[in-house]
């Protein structure tokens, strides 16, 4: 395909292994260190990219305090080969932060405000808890239900509205672990995981090149034994069908098509369209439906044109209604989250948007796909979507 000079292309993608937040591999590694390691290694494996050309490092992170505070993008950038003359900013759209980082870079490239960007995100949920320092305004309850800020209850609501059974959720949860384990065993994550030193359960330092979050022994039967996590009386959402609390980072090198051509770089993909949308916070998990429909319309496509989809698995009770209304339920085994998702790999908030987008590009490459969609719900009622075309 022919590209326009200001088209936005993805040059490379990498991520850390996903670590458990409670006593996991990253327990002695800071968020900025994790981010800097990832950026450095990704630049090292792309020698045609001069770090001095980086216009901006745009890093997603949700809880921007403690080690994640004071513009972690700049903190991490200063610890890499990127010179001090390049800029850096940290962005937050809660769960969609690093996809927003990608969109911010893309919009800059499209408008001629830079040619080379490093984007991604991090969340060390073991060091900085998701509610650390958060103080919601009590008056918000005048405008949205108080439970809208409780993500598990919004998933319960969405599941109930769409008739999603406990068994369907357990099947979806087991599928995530089984597919992630299969992808691991077959080396499907090899191109995206950048090995990192960490500590095993016995405290020994070792190099990790795999996700420690996957539980290959997970079955529908074992998940059926779990109690509801958010609504003890009559609830259906359990810890086993919710995204794991994990630590991780993801990173992409993004360029204008013209600069990639000048440097003799073959891109992974080009961005065809982007979109964000809002929904009632009480059903926050439904956000990917309007954002995906908007992005597809902007690209002149329909969901039937899409070869592969990565939908962030915040909750099975949330993902299944989204897939139903995007008319993907009957295509799930062919198109959706073929390497598992956040139920198995976890959802480090600031990391996930770039993570699912990069995984999508690898799935497209491994399976000969042309068009792909990455999409996710966002806390308090948003959706964000990117449409890619492989080149």
UniProtKB/Swiss-Prot annotation:
GO terms for cellular component: cytoplasm. It comes from Pseudomonas paraeruginosa (strain DSM 24068 / PA7) (Pseudomonas aeruginosa (strain PA7)). This is 3-ketoacyl-CoA thiolase. NCBIfam families: AcCoA-C-Actrans, fadA, PRK08947.1. It catalyses: an acyl-CoA + acetyl-CoA = a 3-oxoacyl-CoA + CoA. Catalyzes the final step of fatty acid oxidation in which acetyl-CoA is released and the CoA ester of a fatty acid two carbons shorter is formed. The active site is at 95 (acyl-thioester intermediate), 347 (proton acceptor), 377 (proton acceptor). It comes from the Bacteria.
């Amino acid at each position: 395909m022919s590209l326009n000079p200001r088209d936005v292309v993805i040059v490379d993608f990498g991520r850390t292994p996903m670590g458990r937040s409670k006593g996991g591999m990253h327990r002695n590694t800071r968020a900025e260190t994790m981010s800097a390691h990832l950026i450095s290694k990704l630049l090292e494996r792309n020698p045609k990219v001069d770090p001095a050309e980086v216009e901006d490092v745009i890093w997603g992170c949700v809880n921007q305090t403690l080690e994640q505070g004071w513009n972690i993008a700049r903190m991490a950038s200063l610890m890499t080969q990127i010179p001090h003359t390049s800029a850096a900013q940290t962005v937050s759209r809660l769960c969609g932060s690093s996809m927003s980082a990608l969109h911010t870079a893309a919009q800059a490239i499209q408008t001629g405000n830079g040619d080379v960007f490093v984007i991604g995100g991090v969340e060390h949920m073991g060091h900085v808890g998701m509610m650390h320092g958060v103080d919601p305004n009590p008056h918000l309850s005048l405008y949205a239900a108080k439970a809208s800020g409780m993500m598990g209850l919004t998933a319960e609501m969405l599941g109930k509205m769409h008739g999603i059974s406990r068994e369907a959720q357990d099947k979806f949860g087991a599928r995530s672990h089984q597919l992630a384990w299969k992808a691991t065993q077959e080396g499907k994550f090899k191109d995206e995981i950048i090995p990192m030193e960490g500590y095993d359960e016995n405290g020994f330092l070792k190099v990790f090149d795999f996700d420690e979050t996957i539980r290959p022994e997970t079955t529908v039967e074992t998940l059926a034994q779990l109690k509801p996590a958010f609504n003890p009386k009559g609830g259906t959402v359990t810890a086993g069908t919710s995204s794991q609390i994990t630590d991780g980072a993801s990173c992409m090198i993004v360029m204008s098509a013209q600069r990639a051509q000048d440097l003799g770089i073959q891109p992974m993909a080009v961005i065809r369209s982007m979109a964000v949308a809002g929904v009632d916070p009480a059903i926050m998990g439904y956000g990917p439906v309007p954002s995906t429909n908007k992005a597809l319309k902007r690209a002149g496509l329909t969901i039937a044109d899409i070869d592969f989809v990565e939908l962030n698995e915040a909750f099975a009770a949330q993902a299944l209604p989204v897939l139903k209304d995007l008319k993907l339920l009957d295509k799930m085994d062919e198109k959706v989250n073929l390497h598992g998702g956040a139920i198995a790999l976890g959802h480090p908030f600031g990391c996930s948007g770039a993570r699912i987008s990069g995984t999508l590009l690898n799935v497209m490459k491994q399976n000969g796909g042309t068009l792909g969609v990455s999409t996710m719900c966002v806390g308090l009622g948003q959706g964000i979507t990117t449409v890619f075309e492989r080149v």
